[in-house]
Amino acid sequence: MTQEVLERSIQVGGRTMTFQTGKIGKQAGGAIFCRYGDTVVSAFATGSAQPREGIDFFPLTVEFEERLYAAGKIPGGFIKREGRPSEKAILSARLIDRPIRPLFPEGYRNDVQVVAQVMSVDQDCASDITGINAASAALTISNVPFEGPVAAVTVGLIGDEFIINPTVEQSEKSVMHLTVAGTKDAVMMVEAGAQEVPEAQMLEAIMFGHREIQRIAEFIENYRLEALERNLAKPKQEVVMKQMPEEIVQAVKAFAYDKMDQAVRTEEKKAREEAIRQVKEEALAHFAEQYPEDLKTIDKILEDFVHKIVRRLITVEHIRPDGRALDEIRPISVEVGILPRTHGTGLFTRGQTQVLTVATLGAVGDEQILDGLGLEESKRYMHHYNFPPYSVGETRPMRGPGRREIGHGALAERALLPVIPNENDFPYTIRLVSEVLESNGSSSMASVCGSTLSLMDAGVPVKSPVAGIAMGLISEENHIAILSDIQGMEDHDGDMDFKVAGTSQGVTALQMDIKIKGVSREILERALTQAKEGRLFILDKMLSVIEKPRPELSPFAPRIITASIHPDKIREVIGPGGKTIKKIIDETGVKIDIEDDGRVFISAVDGEAGENALKIIQALTQEVEVGRIYNGRVTRIMDFGAFVEVIPGVLGLSGKEGLVHISQLAHGRVEKVEDVVKLGDEILVKATGIDKQGRLNLSRKEALPNPNPNPNGSTANKNPRNS
């Protein structure tokens, strides 16, 4: 049996990206085997034949499956198979979801599932970027009514040069890691981390990436056309949208539209929600007898009214639901140090959004070890974001962080990363936890502000303070409104959620999600400019409360002492089976971390305990210097000489000792060792050498003045002064 296979390639960032269909996953709606360098991601897109009844959302799910065989690894643990998705897999799934979600027909209610499976990993060719392009191609050739294709690239910046899909080596030099996704016509999604890059340069990077995206998207579209000719792509499913009965729409409009308009204009969130609920209840009760079978339809009509009213108020009347101007930021309240025993706290309140961020400082050994498909590495700065149901007045089970919480935590972490001091300057592991106590939009950016406050309160010497703001967009016919500091309703009924974080000098993080078919350069430029104005305003509010990091750490934070030993001496500190280092820890109550290069980090809440541990380590690793005179203690007496300890032992461990041969005990002849020294005596000795077996030779004679300095036994000066 001969199978038809279509394989085509395109050059992206100086490497070949190959798309293949017809060989694998032929029962899926669309299947693509995508290879970029040596990274291979297989993407499968499948949609249900019928819409799901009784829902008012699009049931799209995206799974990003990491297989450890892709990196030549076997999973650890007892079960030896992959378990829950890693944080990286969750973020990659979100990265695929966000640009494709807006490109399905409005009102489409069929289940759609996209699965991206990582089968081989080349560290220089990112699996998430490969996954977006593969998923887009799979949807494009499937029967699912996808209005793509989209494509994605990463943009780096080294010097003044933009780089498409930088390698690992290039990424280390780059001051920007920008992921852009879009169609041929517009940008759909932006995700970035940067080292205070100016807004103008960030905009140029986005447009630079989009030019490459246009080329890839056109390639995928041509690939679909060729696949259709070969019967390897499926005709698109016809979408039949259920129309609202015009009679009911007009009846509900006549009864409820003006009332809903007044309800939406209520400025306070809870009062507004209650007013909208009352209008809905009143309308449903009014039409219950006339249209008993259409109450769900009526509820949907009322929701559409809210959506349209909000958009019209903002774009035509320039009135926001809470009465603010389009570029106005909600009232801000800032507090620090509100928890007594934590290392640092920041309470940031903006309108009805409130976040408490707590900073905890730990030892080097507290860093997170990352062991996935990428290179094995560790993370010494972490940010965790929690969004409990009470923050929006709801109840639901609390079963650990969801995808949204992981995504928001990663965004806030990325925003602060460029200003975190390096390990040499501040050898601490830093964990931030943001607790959303109240939310009416923009809680992730409030977490960024709270993070800066808590770090400064903890005494972490951040390079610059960082603030964040969420921008919105509503585009209605010929009217465009860009909103600063969007609240929940504006996010829900708007077209864009554009989060921007940074310092006074530039951008450190970006994230843009949209619900329309893309945004233009002009809109991006306006949003970035307006975001900078808002960010600087917020920074001023924060700095009026805490201007710079505290000069001292919290008394409850550990003190870290750093030292350096020769790498060959590491085994002496650790000891056989770790016995020595365990003894030091038990004796002093400190934490000790030793790097392979000989750096030692001693972490102790009690500074004196840390100093004691340092003295022990110094004693264990101290080298005897040949030619130096030591005050030693006689530990053993033999017929041929005495053993003298020149560096005392610690923790019951032996110190460093050497042999003073009987001939080296004194300047004259010695008949018996005990005639000169006794056990326990403290004597001056000179280190004279170390033999090939590592044994130390000492001399008491050379440490003492010679009573007969000349060969004739005279004590006269060898060079008597001339008379």
UniProtKB/Swiss-Prot annotation:
- Tell where it localizes: Cytoplasm
Per the record, what are the reactions this protein catalyses?
RNA(n+1) + phosphate = RNA(n) + a ribonucleoside 5'-diphosphate
Which cofactors are named for this entry?
A: Mg(2+)
Q: Where is the S1 motif domain?
A: 627-701
Q: Which InterPro entries match?
A: ExoRNase_PH_dom1 (IPR001247), ExoRNase_PH_dom2 (IPR015847), ExoRNase_PH_dom2_sf (IPR036345), KH_dom (IPR004087), KH_dom_type_1 (IPR004088), KH_dom_type_1_sf (IPR036612), NA-bd_OB-fold (IPR012340), PNPase (IPR012162)
Where is the segment annotated Disordered?
Answer: 696-723
KW Lipoprotein (keyword) present: no
CDD domains for this protein: KH-I_PNPase, RNase_PH_PNPase_1, RNase_PH_PNPase_2, S1_PNPase
The Polar residues compositionally biased stretches are 711-723
Q: Which cysteines are joined by disulfide bonds?
A: none
- Binding positions for Mg(2+) per the UniProt entry: D491, D497
Enzyme class at the top of the EC tree: transferase
Give one GO biological process term: RNA processing
- List its EC numbers: 2.7.7.8
Output the superkingdom of the source species: Bacteria
Q: A Gene Ontology CC term for this entry?
A: cytosol
Q: Which Pfam families match?
A: KH_1 (PF00013), PNPase (PF03726), RNase_PH (PF01138), RNase_PH_C (PF03725), S1 (PF00575)
State the PANTHER family in the record.
POLYRIBONUCLEOTIDE NUCLEOTIDYLTRANSFERASE, POLYRIBONUCLEOTIDE NUCLEOTIDYLTRANSFERASE 1, MITOCHONDRIAL
Role description: Involved in mRNA degradation. Catalyzes the phosphorolysis of single-stranded polyribonucleotides processively in the 3'- to 5'-direction.
Matching HAMAP family, A to Z? PNPase
Give the record's family classification.
Answer: Belongs to the polyribonucleotide nucleotidyltransferase family.
Q: Could you tell me what this protein is called?
A: Polyribonucleotide nucleotidyltransferase
